[in-house]
Amino acid sequence: MPGKLVGSSEEAARTGTQANAHAEDHSDLEHSAPSTDDGFDEPKPPIAKSVPPSTAIPKKNNFKQRGNTKNVKPPTLEEMKELRDTQNLFHSNLFKLQVKEMLEELQLKQKYTDFIENWLESFTVFTRQLKDGLMERTHLEVPMKLSEKPTGFVFSKPTREPYLIGAAATGTLLGPKIVVDVALEMPKESLHKEDYLNLRYDQKRALYLTYVTERMMESPDYAQDQFNFNYYANNPLKPVLELIPVTKQVNKHLQVRLFITAPLSSFKPGRFVPWNNNIRPSFYGDEWDEQDPLPSTQHYNANVLFDLTLSENQAQLDKAFKSRRNFQDGLLLLKVWLRQRQLDIGYSGFGAHILAAFIVYLNKQRILHQSSSSYQVARTVWNQLANTDWTKGISLAVDPIQTEELNKFAEHYDVCFIDFTGQHNLCANIPLYLYKRVREEAKLAVELLNDMKLNSFPLIFMQKCPLYSRVDNILKISNYSCINQMLTLHSQPRIKYDFANYGYPQLLHLLTELLKKGLAERVHSILPLETATAAWPVENKAPVIGKYIQLGLILQPEHAYEVLNKGPAANDDLAGAEEFRRFWGEKSNLRRFQDGSITEAVVWGTAQDSPAKKRLIVRHVVLHLLEHHLQLDSKEVQYIGGELDQVYKLSPWFKVNKLKTKLSLDQDTDAEALSPHVIRCYDELARQLHGLNDLPLEIVSISGVSPIFRYCEPQPVLPQALLVENRILASTIQRVVIQLGQSGKWPTELGALRALKTAFLIEIGEKLEAQCRLHWVISADGLLVLKQGYCFLIELAHNKELALLKQEVTERGITTYVDNAASRFLERQHYILPKVSGALHSLHQTYSAFGSTVLLAKRWLATQLLDDGLWPDMATELLVAHLFQQRYAPQSIAAPQTGFIRFLQLLSHSDFNGELFLLNFNNSWQEQQIADLEHNYRSNRQSYPPLAVATSYDMQHAGRLWTSDQSPSQRVLGHVTRLARRALEIIETSLMSKDLRFVRPAQLFRASNEGYDLVIQFKPDLVPNSLSYDLGSPFVSFSQPNFSLPRAGSDYIARIVGLLRSAYSDFAAFFYNPHGGKELAIVWRPTTEFAAKPFKVTELQACRPCGNGKVQVLKETLLEDFKLLLKDFYLRIATPEELKREQREHQKPMRYFEANQAVEESKPKPKKHRKRKGTGKEAPPKKKRLIKSSTLKALK
């Protein structure tokens, strides 16, 4: 179960070691006793009394520093050696302790070791009691599709005792579910000399397994056990028995897999060399020209050789690993690393047995030594994996293989690693792209180890990195008839024979070759995404597998979104141009380019297309290739890439053609595509500000600090701001900070200085109106400027204001300067945020997926009813920036959807209590500064907020500037972690299932309506809708959207919710969607907060007397307070259950309009007006219109 290795990394990290790689089931593991051969050179117990290891380093320091050393013993030789090894091999003593503790926890409990030994002895006795005989009818199903009925099979008693293979033999079993592999060898007499042909060996192997299984089920020793068949490594030619012993000793945490093998001498030497054919075309009813050579079946041959060479290979591995704790522990480290990346799953998986053989290979090459520590073993393997090329072939053969023969071997496989016998390729089924991926992951591991600024242990061993989270796009084909059609019409006969007509590797080869040629430089890797085959009861028929395929594409950001595929010139290369037209079909056209060349070309879009459209180019290419070459309709294919981009698209309810603007806007535009328009408008405004004449002081710097200037605004910003009656109406404002030249004439009193700032802003507004014809309005927050339909808020920053905010006068009259909440806020907004905003803008220029990943992350958090007061927007931006800055994967993120999945992983698996998220922009932090900050963080953790984020521009506020104790609080942080884990489960289930389609945005971007006590509905006409795509409310059905423009900068709902939190956070928690949400969800605090308490003058809020000198908080009183604060915005209060009942009964919740109508109906009807005399006509009826409240009028 590779996907469940790490179940509770947070708990392990709290211990300071992050070493519990099997927290899902602690009962499998135990702490082993210290060993002198564990690769860390543990201090051996000397004859004299030794100094404890934990005090070795401090005593060494004391020995140097103190003059009185009479009672202090110097370190022992063992302790000195251990310290020297720590300094030479590891980043720090912490890393060494983390590795050491993880290895100790990976060791099996003695009860499992005893059980395995006893079970093997019992099974050996059972096999001795088996009798030779004819296999007649069986109530079990043979776990293989046979060409004919199993009649006449003669069972021969095994002549060799069963033996352990794999991890059980080398002492490297890994939990949480322990899988013990046992091999049972068929005797040579069971096979005939012609059994190498046409799957006869494989059929006999399956029959032999069935016979042994049936006898085991009849034996009283195994009567209570659970029997299942399964395919080893998703290979239908490799059925194995999976037996789960039912005993209290192992408690169903152990599984035994029985492999049937055969001796190497069963067939003539050289019968299964890669260039031989062992499956005849006639076996599948095909005709073959006798004059043509038969195609080689190298992959089928390797499949048989796996069984034939297993005994010899295992003997050599046992010899290499026996009593070598360092090799065993090194292999355990590598297995953890491999399993966390899910590179060992399925038919094409890079199995741990390959790494075990590679350790022996490096030992033979004298790259690894007997005395190498476990850490050195793992590091050396990663380093050699990254820097050696197996495509040319490497060999473990006892008898050296000539270079010519090795090259001949390598020609038949993508990857070649010859085993000890010199006949079997251990990497026969590994495709080239997957091997390259393993090399890249190994290279990344070495780079992480070499980064002295980083604690690489959790990144290498603790974090789950499923393969689907490493790819940018995913291609799924699961239609059974389409798969059969492709295999029948397009799979080459030689490939069919090579893989014994197994569909999966044929599909993998067919699609990989086609996409590799069609995508070319657009794609970096094409990786198979496999899931392990599920076991089935032995009484059931073997399932048909291989009729489904899923590929992951890792894109090259530099070339993936190019709109043109340019072919050869028609005049210079006629054959090449013809081949280009044949490959691309009707998409190819002859085009003339600006340089005068005339070539064949395929155009997939225009240079002016939005980033979201360009990200779909690879999708269009893939679907065209499948349709043109494989006749596969796009409806039969599921291509996953960009589905979640919908959440930051413009709402279809808002019609852009009604806007009065010179900009060319599409109805299907989105927030990402609209950002450059605002940035260009801001750049022009900045030039106009710099060009203003006759200002008292020169403007020296202008900085845009709103999220849109760093491509992080999830709501589409349109040029719709208006000037109405000297008031600017705008849905959003863009903040701009300006700084002036130095002057000594500024007041030294805070109020006077702010008044002078306001006067200066007014003068700037007047100059903008006179010289640039721009409308402006002064507000309490700054100068509002209207330009091209966008509203900008200009703020003036001055150092003296910050100093005055910090200024305090002591009782003795001494003036001091002390940081406070107001000064920190001002410093962040005016001086630090401009620098961080510029750094994030630069990050987006480097990684184009950064901004859109932030958009997805912000929209997800907002739809989970988490506003800026509960989870700061800047925290989201900085966490995503942390993802792009850190080397979590060999390739940078090219697709926003992938970035969003990794953001969810960061929220799910991070240890927020022990991790400080550092963003070293421009490498402006020195190593020592980082070390000092991390040390201060660890030693004073309680002084930092629950989520600590620091940038290199934060100065003395590092770690405390962007978040606080309440935003997010510990509870909110835990809530977000649980939400992220659930979202990941939904995504992974939909991605890896062959039956389910990819998750719809509404499944992820809509909050649950469970867990809330009350819901306060707002009047929909007083709360404008967001311009972003509305995915619906978790509480009520869709309502008519309201896109009215409020007064610029007046977010009334946010202010009211802030007031509610500041006044009533001790009694309730408040949640709402800041992107146009029209409901406020409330969760009451525990009942203890509402219990009667003694009377205190300072604690009387919302209380009433309840006798005996006590007071009590009443929820009814609180609700009345809430209504009073919400004033005209409040519509009604209901419980989620009441809202659900209304939905089930198809009753619409009472809307504001209906409420008004009910009120009107309850009033006495007015008297009818009589007709005027002298006129024969009635007065025309007045049009019905909505009478807006005074609050709405105040918005204008």
Swiss-Prot record:
Location of region: Disordered: 1-75, 1140-1196
Region forming the signal peptide: none
Subcellular location: Nucleus, Nucleolus; Chromosome
Gene Ontology biological process terms from the UniProt entry: ribosomal small subunit biogenesis; rRNA processing; tRNA export from nucleus
UniProt keywords, alphabetically: Chromosome, Nucleus, RNA-binding
InterPro entries, per the entry: NOL6/Upt22 (IPR005554), Nrap_D1 (IPR035082), Nrap_D2 (IPR035367), Nrap_D3 (IPR035368), Nrap_D4 (IPR035369), Nrap_D5 (IPR035370), Nrap_D6 (IPR035371)
Start-end of Basic residues biased regions: 1165-1174
UniProt key word Nucleotide-binding: no
Compositionally biased region (Basic and acidic residues): 22-31
GO cellular component, one term: small-subunit processome
Example GO molecular function: RNA binding
Family statement: Belongs to the NRAP family.
Complexes and interactors: Part of the small subunit (SSU) processome, composed of more than 70 proteins and the RNA chaperone small nucleolar RNA (snoRNA) U3.
Role played: Part of the small subunit (SSU) processome, first precursor of the small eukaryotic ribosomal subunit. During the assembly of the SSU processome in the nucleolus, many ribosome biogenesis factors, an RNA chaperone and ribosomal proteins associate with the nascent pre-rRNA and work in concert to generate RNA folding, modifications, rearrangements and cleavage as well as targeted degradation of pre-ribosomal RNA by the RNA exosome.
Name of the protein described by the UniProt record: Nucleolar protein 6
Native source species: Drosophila sechellia
